[in-house]
Amino acid sequence: MEELNFDVVVVGGGPAGSSAARIAAENECTVALIEKEKEIAETVRTSGVTWISDIKKFKIPEDCYNSIKKFSFCSPKNSVTISDNVAKAAVLDVRKTYRFLANRAQSSGAKIFTSTNVSEVLKNSDGKCVGVIAKSKDKHIQFNAKVIIDASGFASVVAKELGHVEQWKKFGVGAEFEVKTEELEQDNWWLMVGQEYSPAGYAWIFPTSKNTARVGVGIGKPDSEVDPTIRLNELIDKKIGPIKDLGEIEKIEFHYGLIPNEGLSRKTVYDNLILVGDSAGQANPLVLEGIRYAIRFGE
């Protein structure tokens, strides 16, 4: 088995993991960033909505997002639109943004290992985490580290394996399609509330360009047993609410994700193990938005 030594090993190549890896590398630590997928952001699990003020703080380029000036809200019987003179919100190109963050970590000195899935957490005689073993293609690699950062998202892979945390009991489940549309206001997003849309959450239309958008449904668990994927397909097929104004819809890609909704209920430091991002529950419990928190806490 190949054995590698690092000051810091980060598990998870999302926004929290890439940000943590970059900061550690900038502070002259040797850093390994481990990502189980073939490439960063191979699978999209978020709608990518955030605020432009935060984007600018994180120095994310303008070509990584679509700006939003109008905010439309509707229930089955009412709707309202609030407009700004300048764009304040944004819908991220999730893949482009995550890869930008990872490339920045790599440029700072972090070594990225893709297609590398953690299979075992290593402990010393005191039960302290000292590394991980991961399967990478046709071999196993032992990563020894002084500090482990669990940025594995909802799964909390390292912390759960060590017995520090249990599965989240309260969480949101989101399903969405990236779609091509006939008609779309590029700078106007929609949030749809009410039983017709989601019995414990909301539905959305988030434009990503002049003719593409993310249309989705989020449902809180265990508050509702409704499957968001089934509800989403019903809304699109029946063209309910503002979805009807999109005209013909061509489904491009399906996204599905889980996000914890228990607030900052977890301890985030266990000796030399640090939890960041969704692993630590660092998300807005009102609308279940977490990218800006993941980057900030990762840093």
Feature locations, PLM:
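Beta1/beta-strand and adjacent pyrophosphate-binding region of the FAD-binding site
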Residues: E2-A16
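Glycine-rich FAD pyrophosphate-binding loop
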Residues: V9, G13, A25-V44
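Conserved Rossmann-like nucleotide-cofactor binding loop
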Residues: A16, E39, A155
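N-terminal FAD cofactor-binding segment of flavoenzymes
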Residues: I23, K36-C74
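N-terminal Rossmann-like dinucleotide/flavin-binding domain of flavoprotein oxidoreductases
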Residues: K56-K57, K70, A89, R95-K111
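Short beta-strand to alpha-helix junction loop
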Residues: D84-N103, V157, G220-T229
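Predominantly flavin-linked oxidoreductase catalytic cores and closely associated redox partners
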Residues: S107-K244, S265, G281
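FAD/FMN-dependent oxidoreductases across multiple families
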Residues: N117, D223-E299
